[in-house]
Regions:
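N-terminal membrane topogenic signal
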Residues: 28-44, 127-129
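Alpha-helical transmembrane segments of polytopic membrane proteins
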Residues: 37-41, 77, 101-110, 157-171, ...
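Aromatic-anchored segments of alpha-helical transmembrane domains
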Residues: 48-53, 136-148, 208-214
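Membrane-interface coil-to-helix junctions
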Residues: 53-94, 98, 102-103
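Juxtamembrane "helix-exit" motif on the non-cytosolic side of transmembrane helices
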Residues: 55-64, 143-156
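Transmembrane-helix motifs of polytopic, lipid-linked glycan transferases
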Residues: 109-127, 141-145, 171-175
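Internal/C-terminal transmembrane anchor helices
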Residues: 195-220
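Soluble catalytic regions of membrane-associated enzymes that act on cell-envelope
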Residues: 220-388, 392, 409-430
């Protein structure tokens, strides 16, 4: 009897111990195999932080320059007249943190993380779908990336921040209503870790965010780089601007223009202007006041090549057509300062200082205003003064855009203007102009390599031309002939496809030479056609 009793007791103990052992085993198996809510939100938050702070922050900083905000109604009259004008006014106020690049990135990331977390709460999905709410911030970022230049060029710059705050408010309201209507149980509020391969919400949101990060890098590199170059231009970081241009896989006109501005300030324009590839991509812009990409760079290019009045005029046109933008107000103030128009400059400074955080800019301008020596001694403005026109002619006398048309057509100027005029002729592939200006240039300095290469190309149809130029080495002549020999069989196909095939075959070994630019560069004229009155 005792044996049967002991047997039954052992069986009971075994049955009791089995679930405990299973439970213990289950708890132990969660280590490294299960993902909790904190891990989900940490991973997605880091991805958003990476995009907002590291990748997209230059665009946010430039958005601050495309913005204008004042607490007073009169300076904001243009905005207030628009439909939902007061909403746009609030949106422009909410953009103010973008004034600091890293603060703006953190601000954007915080809004997106909170929105995603609140959307998750509103959806109240099962544990394996935790994090699915972050698909909404990913979709908003995908829209911002897809818009590209249209996010701010001739469009209301506050749309992005308004959409962000709208998403946050809607998510908060939805989460609040969900919390009121449904009482949380202990099971729902528990951590509820799930196996990593079952974390569908995390996987979907991660894939969506990685797609946005990768797509922005692949298709919107020029937007980010041009914004970064404009930001660096405000700090006179010419070397940083050049580095940005060299990093571009296929620079657009904006990147090329700011690259030239930086090289000009470094005094290296003719030495390095053809270091980048001038195979311009087609930029798709909204047809708002025109589809010309030039609105992004013409005013600054005119100003920094010494055409101060032309830069002022272009900025004023955009100011009138598109409403107040800090970027154009600052340029008009600087142009007025350089032209010693003190009252006009003070007028623009009056508007600028109504915007928060712009006191330092106004103070710096006022310290120079009316002091010709101080302006000449300041590196950036002193350099601009060296390029001021010596000919008294109207803008209409030259092809557009002025910073190219003037330098192609100018007949007299300073030694510095001679450099820019040669560069403009090289860019325009105007051989007669190149030959004429190079004759003057060789009297001032040793001919740069790109000029020597251009003259050798010109000599193919002008025997004896090189006799007029000293210092063109046999090495340069042989190099150009070598290029022509390699390119000749590739140039037989005159179709667009054939030209692109030729460019691809030569770009690796010959990019950076004038031969490559002359035969393979700046051929895509779909976005900005070259005519008798325009320079592409």
């Amino acid at each position: 009897m005792s044996k049967n009793y002991n047997k039954r007791q052992a069986e009971t103990a075994a049955k009791t111990a089995a679930p405990a052992a299973t439970q213990k085993k289950g708890k132990g198996s969660r280590k490294g195999l299960h993902i909790g809510g904190r891990t989900v939100y940490a991973v997605l938050g880091l991805l958003l932080l990476f995009f907002c702070v590291w990748e997209f922050s230059p665009v946010l900083r430039h958005l601050a320059e495309e913005n204008y905000f004042s607490f007073e109604a009169l300076p904001m009259a243009y905005v207030l007249r628009e439909p939902l004008g007061h909403v746009l006014w609030i949106g422009r106020f909410l953009m103010l943190p973008f004034h600091w690049q890293w603060v703006g990135g953190l601000y954007l990331a915080a809004l997106l993380v909170i929105s995603g977390w609140l959307a998750d709460k509103a959806l109240a999905c099962k544990a394996q779908w935790r994090g699915i709410g972050f698909v909404l911030p990913a979709m908003l970022l995908a829209w911002a990336s897809w818009r590209g230049y249209n996010l701010f060029l001739r469009n209301e710059p506050s749309l992005l921040i308004l959409w962000l705050w709208g998403l946050l408010i809607v998510s908060a309201l939805a989460a609040g209503v969900k919390g009121l209507l449904r009482k949380k149980t202990a099971e729902e509020t528990a951590e509820e870790p799930v196996r990593w391969y079952k974390a569908g919400g995390l996987w979907l949101s991660t894939i969506a965010l990685l797609a946005v990060i990768g797509g922005t890098y692949a298709f919107r590199q020029n937007v980010i780089l041009s914004c970064d170059m404009q930001n660096k231009m405000m700090d006179a970081d010419w070397e940083g601007m050049v580095d940005d241009a060299l990093a571009a896989r296929q620079p657009d006109r904006s990147v090329a223009a700011y690259h030239a501005i930086a090289l000009n300030h470094q005094g290296q324009l003719l030495e390095h202007v053809f270091d980048i590839d001038y195979n311009y991509p087609t930029v798709k812009l909204d047809s708002i006041g025109g589809m010309d990409e030039g609105v992004n760079y013409i005013a600054e290019s005119n100003f920094h090549c010494g055409l101060v009045q032309s830069g002022y005029h272009y900025a004023m046109e955009q100011h009138v057509m598109g409403g107040p933008r800090l970027r154009f107000l600052k340029l008009m103030a600087l142009a007025s300062m350089v032209n010693d128009e003190r009252e006009l400059c003070e007028r623009y400074l009056h508007f600028i200082e109504k915007m928060p955080f712009e006191g330092e800019f106004c103070e710096n301008v006022r310290n120079l205003l009316g002091n010709a020596k101080a302006i000449a001694d300041e590196p950036t403005f002193g350099r601009i003064l060296q390029f001021l026109p010596r000919e008294q002619k109207f803008e209409q006398n030259f092809r557009t855009p002025p910073f190219l048309g003037y330098n192609v057509g100018v007949l007299s100027g300073t030694d510095e203007t001679l450099n820019t005029s040669v560069a403009a002729a090289l860019y325009s592939k105007d051989m007669e102009n190149i030959i004429m200006r190079s004759q003057y240039l060789q009297q001032k300095r040793t001919l740069p390599l790109c000029v020597q290469q251009a003259l050798v190309i010109a000599s193919f149809k002008r025997p004896g031309l090189l006799d007029n130029f000293k210092g063109i080495s046999s090495y340069v002549q042989n190099e150009v002939v070598n290029f022509a020999t390699i390119a000749a069989p590739l140039s037989k196909d005159k179709s667009e496809k054939g030209k692109e095939a030729m460019r691809q075959a030569l770009v690796k070994d010959w990019k950076g030479t004038y031969m490559f630019y002359y035969y393979c560069g700046n051929l895509n004229q779909t976005a900005q056609k070259q005519t008798q009155t325009n320079v592409n």
